[in-house]
C-alpha cells in the first residue's frame, strides 16, 4: 500500500485476480513437488524453488546498499517490498508506484527532505530510486516514532495522521483501528523473520 493514505480506510477482501494468483501459486508448488519426486530432483533444489515462489527476493544488492546507507534491517526492507508489491513493479488503484508502492506526492516530499532536485514520476519504476525513496521514508518514520517498528510500519501503510490518533509513539498492534493496516503490520513483521531465516547470506546478515 501507499505511504500516503486517507483516513477513511476499511479492510479489503482479496480480489478475484488475487485469488487466482494464490490458486496458481499453490498449483505451481504442487507441480514442482510432483516433478521433483518423479525425476529425482534433490530435496534442496525443490525447497529452493518453492522458496523462490512463496518468498521471492530480487534486487538484494540494492536492498543491502540502501539498508546500510539508511541504517535499516535489510530483512525489514525486503518484507516491506514483499507486502507492498510481491517484488513486482506495479501501480496500485491509489496511484502508488513501484516495488515499495510510493505515491508521487510522497516521493516529492521525500525528494524535498533528502535534498533531491530532479524527481519525475517515471523514476519510481526504477528499482534503485524506488527502494532508495522507500528506505528513506521508512527511516524517517522509524526516527519519527523513536524506533517503534509497529508505529512506523502502520504509518507507512495508513499515514502518520492515523497512527498519531491511535497512539503515536506508544502504538501497539492491538491499537491499530484499520484491520487492513493491522494485517499489513503483522505480515511485514512475520516476513521480516522469514527473510532473516531464509536469505541471511543474500541480505548480508551473516557478515
What are these regions (language model features)?
Residues 42-207:
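Catalytic glycan-binding domains that act on GlcNAc-containing polysaccharides
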Amino acid at each position: 500500500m501507499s505511504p500516503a493514505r486517507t483516513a477513511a480506510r476499511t479492510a479489503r477482501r482479496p480480489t478475484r485476480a488475487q485469488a487466482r494468483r494464490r490458486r496458481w501459486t499453490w498449483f505451481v508448488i504442487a507441480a514442482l513437488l510432483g516433478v521433483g519426486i518423479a525425476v529425482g530432483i534433490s530435496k534442496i533444489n525443490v525447497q529452493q524453488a518453492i522458496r523462490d515462489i512463496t518468498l521471492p527476493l530480487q534486487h538484494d544488492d540494492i536492498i543491502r546498499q540502501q539498508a546500510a546507507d539508511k541504517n535499516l534491517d535489510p530483512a525489514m526492507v525486503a518484507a516491506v517490498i514483499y507486502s507492498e508489491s510481491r517484488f513486482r513493479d506495479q501501480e496500485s488503484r491509489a496511484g502508488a508506484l513501484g516495488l515499495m508502492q510510493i505515491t508521487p506526492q510522497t516521493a516529492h516530499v521525500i525528494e524535498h527532505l533528502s535534498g533531491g532536485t530532479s524527481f519525475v514520476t517515471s523514476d519510481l519504476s526504477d528499482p534503485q530510486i524506488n527502494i532508495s525513496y522507500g528506505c528513506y521514508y521508512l527511516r524517517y518514520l522509524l526516527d519519527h516514532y523513536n524506533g517503534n517498528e509497529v508505529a512506523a510500519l502502520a504509518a507507512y501503510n495508513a499515514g502518520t495522521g492515523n497512527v498519531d490518533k491511535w497512539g503515536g509513539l506508544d502504538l501497539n498492534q492491538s491499537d491499530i483501528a484499520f484491520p487492513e493496516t493491522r494485517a499489513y503490520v503483522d505480515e511485514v513483521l512475520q516476513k521480516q523473520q522469514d527473510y532473516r531465516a531464509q536469505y541471511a547470506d543474500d541480505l548480508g546478515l551473516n557478515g
